[in-house]
Regions:
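Short beta->alpha connector loops
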Residues: 21-24, 79-83, 172-176
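His/Asp/Glu-enriched, well-ordered alpha-helical/loop segment
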Residues: 234-301
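Divalent metal-dependent hydrolysis catalytic cores, especially in the metallo-beta-lactamase
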Residues: 14-15, 27-54, 67-80, 96-108, ...
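Histidine/acidic residue-rich metal-binding segments in metalloenzymes
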Residues: 3-4, 87-100, 108-241
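Active-site neighborhoods of metal-dependent hydrolases
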Residues: 192-259, 307-340
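Short, electropositive alpha-helical surface patch
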Residues: 73, 92, 147-165, 183-194, ...
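Histidine-centered catalytic micro-motifs
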Residues: 10-22, 135-141, 192, 245
Length: 343
């Protein structure tokens, strides 16, 4: 059933966002802040955000970059096993989650975790359980690139079983194995990107290489995308939208050693609307996927924002301040007509 020609999404949230720092932060922050009410901000800067002072300082830089936009940056900390209870208690009110990266698996993750020894991780993860701090995880091994996420599912299961009170967010899932894990443990949740709902590996490398679709985790097989679509379109109660929008300068993408990341922030809501309509999923499911589930899972109350979408063709700009978005130069079905503060 087609969506109305115009309709309103209430308080959209992006539960996995890269805003970078410095000039890049100032160039792209408003692309998210103008249409989302808030976002979970990734901590993998150089150096990574790993102290209370760094969290506060980075949040201040984000707030400066977004200006007067009605947008809440929900901050995260880069996980280290050395964090103790006193340290975490001191910054509990400054963060929404802590992000765990396997060492060297993605951009600026060299200081991440190696080995996943449960006993080594126990003090920090038990403290997080007690303090109700969610653990967000980039779930990939260092194995063959197409198998990395599926191989990591066993680590998710070990963590979920060892720390049953710990809320574990499987970030940007891309495989049917990760989808299946959702219902095996009550403390496993997930985010899904918009680009992984649209593309498979064929779109990235089946013809001419498409550097602006290259990301980590890499896009997978059609059957994996189908598994993602099923839980996203149904707004599975443990699944949230998280763009993993990851800007890089054009020269870092269109080069040998192409940087991993797809920039979707300016068009994420339009693409999701197009997707849900194409699959006859009701607007209520879209609303839950882009806001309701996240508010419940994270127990947050963001500032209200209303985004009015219109069924009118929109040509995606070639770039946003030097960053090339997904589908640059192509026409998509929906335009954002108006954004206003909600009631």
């Amino acid at each position: 059933m087609p969506f109305p020609t115009q309709f309103t999404l209430d308080t959209p949230l992006d539960m996995h966002l890269h805003l970078r720092d410095g000039e890049m932060l100032h160039n792209i922050a408003k692309a998210s802040a103008q249409t989302f009410s808030g976002a979970i901000i990734m901590p993998n800067l150089v150096p990574p955000v790993s102290s209370k002072e760094e969290v506060i300082a980075y949040k201040a830089r984000i707030e400066e970059a977004i200006g007067t936009e009605n947008f809440t940056p929900y901050m995260t900390l880069f996980f280290k096993p050395v964090y103790d209870r006193a340290f975490l208690e001191d910054l509990r009110d400054d963060i929404a989650a802590i992000k765990l990266y396997p060492a060297g698996i993605t951009t600026n993750s060299e200081g991440g975790v190696s080995g996943f020894d449960i006993e080594e991780l126990r003090p920090a993860l038990e403290a997080m359980s007690d303090l109700d701090i969610p653990l967000c995880v980039h779930g990939e091994t260092n194995g063959f690139v197409m198998d990395r996420e599926a191989e990591f599912v066993s680590i998710y299961e070990r963590l979920a079983a060892a720390f049953p009170r710990l809320k574990i967010i499987m970030e940007h899932i891309t495989t049917k194995e990760s989808v299946a894990a959702l219902d095996r443990f009550k403390n496993l949740y997930a985010t899904i990107t918009v680009h992984h709902l649209f593309i498979t590996l064929d779109d990235v490398a089946g013809g001419m290489l498409q550097p602006h679709l290259f990301c980590k985790p890499i896009a997978k097989r059609p059957e994996d995308r189908e598994a993602l679509l099923k839980v996203a379109l149904d707004a599975h109660p443990k699944v949230m939208f998280g763009s993993d929008s990851a800007p890089h300068p054009r020269e870092a993408k269109e080069s040998c050693g192409c940087a991993a990341g797809v920039f979707t922030a300016p068009i994420a809501l339009q693409l999701l609307t197009q997707l849900f309509e194409a699959h006859d999923a009701p607007i209520e499911k879209l609303q839950a996927f882009i806001s309701g589930n996240a508010r419940r899972i994270y127990d947050i109350t963001p500032s209200a924002k209303e985004v009015v979408l219109e069924k009118r063709p929109f040509v995606v700009p070639a770039d946003y301040n030097g960053v090339v978005p997904m589908y640059a130069g192509e026409t998509i079905d929906y335009t954002i007509r108006e954004v206003r503060d909600g009631q």
